[in-house]
């Protein structure tokens, strides 16, 4: 029997399965085991965090020269005021640089970091950030020490009056640890191992952005779909629109959501500190189990979200009341209350519900909710579009707005912004089956329109378009007859078949 530490608690057992049986863990998720120290951590730092009055800048030491060695040994001497700023570079100083002076001109690229001696006076030493490709005399034989790897936007904002507040080395420690990432629960244990089965994510920030993360992690899973030395990211909700806010420095363990640009909607967890970014909304931080983040490069991780998500949509009225009761939330009910599913909630976001301590929910008879299936394998792009348009990306029940109805076709409003990349896929060939759900693809000027055809057709798809302009995204499996009575302007609620 081996004595080990599991999530901070002492346990005794022969296999991993024995010692984690009472621990929070999702089957198939990564487990990180720290066996011990493999070798000493790198004593000479390769990265430095430079804290300024405008934000943080991270530099990587890329050169192995006397200038770089001087900076590594004397980095605290460069905690100085901004000395000059131009379109070419920005410098902080001055301090003494006791190195051999040179008048040889050197070429530098944008984001190079160099040390400079002004006027060939060793007491006029500076650290300089290059903003544009340049050539000049910087007073040293080998001025370059490294490159900027984080906080480039900070450099562009620096002005007279700013200063460096502190400089800290960032030490690389991952290689110094003898560790194992496994999903094998029958693994034989050894004395002294430290075992981590989950991490805790604590959220507090912009309510809509926090809700995005709570929805992503609602099933207790964080899926690593992107991995770098700086962060891991879960991309499952990529392309969803995110509200900006909470633009603070991204410290180690912080959780952010990208709020615009390529990768909008991705959720990041940071292994290393980075300066704030206009494209990242900070929403929380890892409180326990960051070892899972440090050592997992792929796979899924078990996560406990604090607070848990308080979204009643898709629950029965009784289930919703029970959930809110745990938090002493006052519940106001409206709509159908018997045999009903919650389809609306106000406030919508968990943090707002906890703040206001009351919530209004609206129920709808189960027979009035359209149960559907989506052809995720045959039409993945269209299925994702349908989820985003209806809200099924983050909610259990989605909503469609009736645009018009004609005979056996019901048309719903689409989302033009999301419809831009709707390539043809799963196009009908011979006929369209009754209760098929279709989306007009980009072959048509009306791309993104969503329709249901209640009857069969061998000529036109569910949106009234010809087959080559129609993507079949799914079908209705229950309560299709309810659509016979809807009219223009109605909202129709849809539920994915389990």
Curated annotation (Swiss-Prot):
Superkingdom of origin: Archaea
HAMAP family in UniProt: UPF0288
Family of the protein in this entry: Belongs to the UPF0288 family.
Listed name of the protein: UPF0288 protein MJ1412
UniProt source species: Methanocaldococcus jannaschii (strain ATCC 43067 / DSM 2661 / JAL-1 / JCM 10045 / NBRC 100440)
């Amino acid at each position: 029997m081996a004595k080990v530490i599991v999530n901070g608690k002492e346990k005794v057992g022969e296999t991993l399965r024995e010692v984690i049986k009472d621990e929070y863990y999702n089957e198939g998720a990564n487990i990180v085991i720290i066996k011990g120290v493999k070798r000493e951590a790198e004593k000479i730092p390769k990265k430095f965090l430079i804290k300024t009055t405008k934000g943080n800048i991270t530099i990587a030491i890329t050169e192995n020269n006397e200038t770089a060695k001087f900076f590594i040994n004397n980095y605290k001497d460069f905690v100085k005021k901004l000395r000059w700023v131009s379109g070419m570079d920005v410098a902080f100083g001055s301090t003494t640089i006791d190195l051999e002076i040179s008048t040889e001109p050197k070429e530098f690229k944008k984001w190079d970091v160099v040390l400079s001696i002004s006027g060939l006076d060793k007491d006029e030493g500076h650290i300089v950030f290059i903003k544009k490709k340049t050539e000049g005399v910087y007073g040293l034989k080998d001025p370059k020490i490294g490159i900027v790897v984080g906080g480039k936007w900070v450099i562009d904002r620096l002005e007279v009056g700013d200063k460096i507040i502190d400089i800290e080395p960032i030490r690389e420690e991952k290689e110094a640890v003898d560790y194992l990432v496994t999903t094998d629960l029958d693994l034989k244990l050894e004395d002294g191992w430290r075992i981590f089965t989950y991490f805790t994510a604590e959220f507090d920030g912009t309510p809509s952005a926090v809700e995005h993360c709570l929805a992503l992690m609602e099933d207790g899973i964080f899926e690593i779909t992107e991995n770098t030395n700086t962060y891991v990211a879960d991309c499952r909700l990529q392309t969803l629109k995110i509200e900006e806010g909470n633009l603070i420095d991204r410290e180690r363990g912080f959780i952010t959501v990208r709020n615009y640009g390529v990768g909008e909607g991705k959720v990041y967890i940071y292994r290393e500190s980075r300066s704030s970014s206009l494209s990242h909304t900070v929403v929380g931080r890892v409180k326990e189990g960051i070892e899972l983040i440090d050592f997992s490069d792929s796979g899924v991780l078990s996560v406990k979200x604090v607070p848990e998500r308080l979204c009643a949509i898709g629950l029965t009225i009784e289930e919703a009341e029970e959930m809110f009761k745990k938090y002493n939330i006052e519940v106001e009910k409206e709509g159908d209350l018997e045999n009903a599913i919650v389809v609306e909630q106000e406030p919508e976001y968990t943090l707002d519900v906890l703040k206001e301590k009351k919530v209004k929910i609206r129920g709808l008879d189960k027979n009035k909710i359209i149960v559907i299936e989506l052809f995720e394998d045959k039409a993945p792009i269209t299925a994702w579009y349908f989820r985003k348009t209806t809200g099924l990306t983050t909610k259990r029940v989605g909503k469609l707005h009736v645009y018009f109805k004609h005979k056996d076709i019901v048309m719903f409003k689409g989302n033009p912004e999301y419809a831009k990349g709707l390539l043809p896929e799963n196009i009908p060939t011979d006929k369209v089956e009754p209760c098929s759900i279709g989306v007009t693809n980009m072959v048509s000027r009306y791309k993104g329109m969503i329709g249901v055809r209640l009857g069969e057709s061998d000529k036109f798809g569910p949106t009234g378009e010809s087959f080559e302009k129609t993507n079949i995204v799914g079908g209705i499996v229950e309560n299709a007859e309810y659509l016979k009575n809807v009219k223009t302007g109605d909202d129709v609620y849809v539920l994915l078949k389990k």
